[in-house]
Amino acid sequence: MSDLLVQDELVVDKKEIQGSFAPLGMTASEVDAEDEDETPFDKLREECGVMAIHGHPDAARMTYWGLYALQHRGQESAGIASADGQQVNDIKGMGLVSEIFTDDVLEKLPGHIAIGHTRYSTTGDSALLNAQPISVESTRGLIAIAHNGNLINLGTAKERLERDGAIFQTTSDSEIIIQLIAHSAKNTLIDCIADALTQVQGAFSIVMMTRNRIFAARDPHGFRPLAMGRIEGKDGAPDTFCFASETCAFDLLHA
């Protein structure tokens, strides 16, 4: 599992900061192979795009520009969730980023942190319920996730969660991860996330948020890209940190 680094209210993947590294003991084809016992989940392809912003007064708009630059990674649906430390708001829709997020819509997403997702079209059903970010209320508060990748042990993980009382609202494998976090017996949220990621197999990059924190992680072999950028604060303001599936998302943000 990827190491997670906690810094103030920002949680990042330490191995991503250190740079990419070679896969150990697995090939890309093995990671992308489907589990024989897998249920008919809606598969999220590696082309999906994820974006996260931490520490900007207009985080949703910054996330919008990042997703706009990542539009080539997915044209089926897009979504943004933002938070101001007290409340999380999210808006999702079918279509292109620019079609969904007009200026009026972005004004409904206040806050200094945000995550976003743009989804690649699949051969399965195209439905708004599978658009991301996905949010779940848990005993540790609201958690929202945007995920890019392919998990190969969905069937067994889902069956175990359902035996423990989990109720699934989507057919997205991303909900497996967020349910594993919500059902973890660990004491702190960061430990719950680490615990959940040890239980999934495959290739993934993930950005998550609560009402006041951002988390980012990727699979231990680095099969799915996740880059980290920084926007220098002006006039004494703190720096803004951002995460994206590709560094092209940072260009419009001057990161």
Give the label of every model feature segment.
Residues S2-A255:
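Conserved short alpha-helical segments that host acidic/polar catalytic motifs at enzyme active sites
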